Swiss-Prot record:
The keyword Transcription applies. The lineage of its organism: Bacteria, Bacillati, Bacillota, Bacilli, Bacillales. It comes from Geobacillus sp. (strain WCH70). This is HTH-type transcriptional regulator Hpr. GO terms for molecular function: DNA binding; DNA-binding transcription factor activity. One of its GO terms (biological process) is negative regulation of DNA-templated transcription.
Amino acid sequence: MKTTEQNYSIKEAMLFSQRIAQLSKALWKSIEKDWQQWIKPFDLNINEHHILWIAYHFKGASISEIAKFGVMHVSTAFNFSKKLEERGLLSFSKKQDDKRNTYIELTEKGEEVLLKLMESYDPTQNAVFNGALPLRELYGKFPEILEMMCIIRNIYGDDFMEIFERAFENIKNDFVEQDGKLVKRNAKSQEKEKELTSQSS
């Protein structure tokens, strides 16, 4: 039987886990309030917005994938997805080679709502953003929270972090800032950028 040597004290372990727990609770309280305010005009709750977000980046995800990457129970993912389907924001389907799983995809209306949400984002109304602003002014960039990401990777696995990173990479590539708003880059400007990149290399 494999034994691992305990090279930490119980007090140290308790202090660390409670520090993380209480800081996370305080942070979540603020995040939840701002998130709800942001999506309120679109008549969405946090789970519904998260489902739309994941569906956008997956381009077709199973309910179990939605549950996994949305950190919610499968029944929660299914029930909220159903509500979004009733509103015409999602469509449900089965794959020919996978009849067991239910897959969801954003409808045109669903993508439209998500893009309008992106456009309506106002950083001045976000407490976490404003709380991190002094650090950006001091160091020239926002905190990368690498230690937190490492902890999350160790809890939820590599797949979770790959999807997490893919979503933010998509935003970097698919969206541009226009008149102080985030808007989806149109196909023509994407082609033009690719041409310029290939010419310069």
